Amino acid sequence: METKDLMKYDQLSPFEVKDKLIELAQSHHERMMLDAGRGNPNWVTTTPRHGFFQLGLFALQEAERSFTDMAHFGGYTQSEGLKARFDRFVQDHTGTAGIDFLKQGIDYAEKALGIPPADLLLQFCDAIIGNHYPVPDRMLKHCETICAAYIRKEFGAGRPFDRAFDLFAVEGGTAAMTYVFQTLKENKILNVGDTIAIGSPIFTPYLEIPRLNDYRFVEVEIAA
């Protein structure tokens, strides 16, 4: 796009600019642009998904080691010899998309975070199959360790960030916002009819949730 053409977009809102960029991207498929969007991107990262599905296949193999006399049934993951069986699975699927990513993740957790591979594999296999539901009630133990390390790295701004904290995994950003508002209300920090400030533009549900009958907050938008 020519510089002179860009000038006419100066007066558009961020949402209007976003819509125009999507229009341009869809009209030039030979040079598609990635749309980070507001929760609905036009792309997916494929490598982690390949790794996820390979983990699922391995977990199913582990489940099928139990109840072998019953067709189409499986049991809980057995911890004894689990790491050795995983290593064989990786070797047998050398070159398959996602295998290297999965193995590298297990190796990283051991070397960087001190998580025993067998313990992590047991937890991952149980989780992806859905064993022991609804335990845990908050977050998988080793997943919390991994996520906490990520948060320390990304939000520590290069400074030491060693204070312990708990994490609570939720369904997604919208659910998280709902829980935040509900917690603030239950603890009497916010009450029905209170005024809150919200930075915008932002994912639309974040603007809509405070208006629900449960909260009825008065919103003041802080435009970016």
Regions found by a protein language model. Name each.
Residues 1-105:
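Conserved N-terminal helix/loop that builds the PLP phosphate-binding region
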Residues 70-224:
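Conserved core of the PLP fold type I
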